[in-house]
Amino acid sequence: MGIFITPLWSEYIVSADQGGIFMDHFNVYSDIQARTGGEIYIGVVGPVRTGKSTFIKRFMELLVLPGLEDVHARERARDELPQSSAGKTIMTTEPKFIPKEAAKLSLGDGVEVRVRLIDCVGFMVEGAAGHIENEKERMVRTPWYEEEIPFTAAAELGTRKVITDHSTIGLVVTADGSFGELKRENYVPAEEKTVQELKKLGVMEWN
């Protein structure tokens, strides 16, 4: 799994040996809080069937839901969690903001942010299922075109929009083939495509 910071932050997260100013994790969070007014959008991207929705669900369950004091807000946010399952079938069909209303998250030392995660379909992987129907690729409607377009094209377009238009932080979810029914090598082309899309924006990798 890799974390990428969009161009707004990249110049500040360069190590000294790269000619930049080193910042620890706390200072990064504090700086992002100040520059965004405390509202952070985490775009969870990568190939299909890597566990992006599962990551979002666990992130919400562990870090966000426990901090929601209003029981009704907590239940609404729980109802908005994405579905996840094992197997080859693609579960996510379009980009989705989770939760619908940004939730407060404390990062410690007085740093509080409002967080929304963005789920997306991801780039297609050989062997994945759910995009073919009657031996033809499914045609789907999107907010971006009046006519129907192929599922794969819609998935790529939505994923690129999450990367380029909506995310403060891009989080790439990868798979090593140790879970699920797809082999590691099936994921590699889609992983490379995801990282290349991020690098086009001039983002910096943060390990």
Regions found by a protein language model. Give the residues of each.
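Short, Lys/Arg-enriched N-terminal segments with co-localized hydrophobic residues
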Residues: 3-22
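Residue-identity detector for threonine
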Residues: 6, 36, 50, 54, ...
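Conserved G1/Walker A P-loop phosphate-binding module
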Residues: 19-147
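Conserved C-terminal guanine-recognition region of P-loop GTPase G domains, centered on the G4
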Residues: 146-207
